[in-house]
Amino acid sequence: MKIKMKVLQVIPRLGYGGAETGCYDLAHFLAEENCKSFIVTSGGELLKYIKKKSVKVFRLPVHSKNPVLIFFNSLIISLIIILYNINIVHARSRAPAWSCLIATKLTMRKFVTTFHGTYNFNNKFKKFYNSVMVRSHLVIAGSNFIFSHIKSYYGNFFIDGRRKLLVIFRGINTNYFHSNRIPISKIDNFSNKYNIDRNKFIILMPGRLTNWKGQKLFIESLKLVLIHENSNMQPFQAIILGDEQGRSVYKKQLIDLVQQCRLGKFVKFINRCDEMPIAYSISNLVCSCSIEPETFGRVAVEAQSMEVPIIASDIGGSTETIIKDKTGFLFKRGDVNNLANTILMVMQKDYNSLKSIGLEGRKNVLKKFDVNKMCSTTFAEYKKLIELS
C-alpha cells in the first residue's frame, strides 16, 4: 500500500531570506504533488502569501533558543506529528532542529535538516549545539562549499553510514525573477518613490545591513570608482538596499562613512523592497561584497535570473553559482581596490556586452538553480526515506 507523504517543515521565522523562501516554495510544491504540507514557525512576512488550502501553518515560538521553550516546542511538535500522522520532519535552523530531533525520537519519524550556514563555534558547547544539524537521517547541504564544511567539521557523524549527506542547490522562482514580467508602472513607481535617476548607471547592493555582508567595503570601493571614472563613463548611482534589523548603530556608521567619502550625492539607502525583481530591473550592475563565505549566494543567482551582471566575492557559494567572466565577475574577498577596478571594468563595457552577460546568467540559472529542480530533488529524497521505513 502506497503511503501518502505528509511533511512538516520547521523554521524560526518565515521572512524573505533564502532559507525561508526555500521553505515556502517547497511547501507549495509538495501540495501540488498531492502531499500534505505543514509548516511550524513563529511568524514572518511570507505568512500572508501562504495558500491556506494547500499548506497548514502552526504558530509556535520556534525562534527561541531558551532550553525550556525548545523542550516545550518538542512536545507540541510531537503532538502535531501524531495528530496529523506526519512522515517527515524537516528542520531549517538549530534551535527548532533540537525540538524536531526530540520529537522525531519520541514519535519514531524521519528527520531531515538543511545546513544553511557555517555556524561559527568557539568552544565545545557551541559545536555540540550546532551538531544538531547533522543528527538527522538526511542532511542537505545548499552548496558544495557547505558540503565540504560539514565533512571537515562533522565528518565523524557520517562514518557509520546511518546518515546521508548530499548537495541540493537552492533554487529560485525564475518566473518571478524574470525581467520581462515586471509592469513598467511598478518600475516607474519605485523609481519615483526613491528619486532614482535611471539615466545613471545604477549599482545595486542588496542584503540585510550587517558587517559581514560588506557594505563598508562597497562604500569604500565607490570612493575609488568616483576618483578614477573618466568623462566617457556614465555617472553612477549606488543603492544599498537592506533592512537594518535593529542594527541602528551599524546603519549610522554606514551613513557616516558615505559622508566621509563624500558620496552623499551618489549613494542611496533603501530599507526594504517587497518585490526584489523591481529593484533588480532598474539596475545595471549588482554587487555582493560579503567578507565571510555565503552558503549559497542568493543575490548572485537572483541577479543572473534577472539578466543583470553580478560582481561577488571569490568565496563561498558565489564561486559555484557564477561562471567567472561569463555570467558575472569575482573579486578578491575584502580587497577594496580589486572591487573598485572590477566595478570600473563593468561600467566601461558597452550595452551589447552587458546584455550578453545578462543572457548567459539567465541560462545558467535556468539550467542549475531553478526552484522546481530544488523541490523535485528534495521530494525524491523524501520518497527514498519513506521507502526505507
Stretches found by the model and what they are:
Residues 136-167, 172-179:
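A short, active-site helix/loop in glycosyltransferases that binds the activated sugar's phosphate group
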Residues 39, 309-312, 322:
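Short hydrophobic beta-strand element within catalytic cores of glycosyltransferases
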Residues 324-325, 329-336, 345-351:
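Conserved acidic donor-binding segment of nucleotide-sugar-dependent glycosyltransferases
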Residues 91-97, 115:
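Short His-centered aromatic/hydrophobic patch
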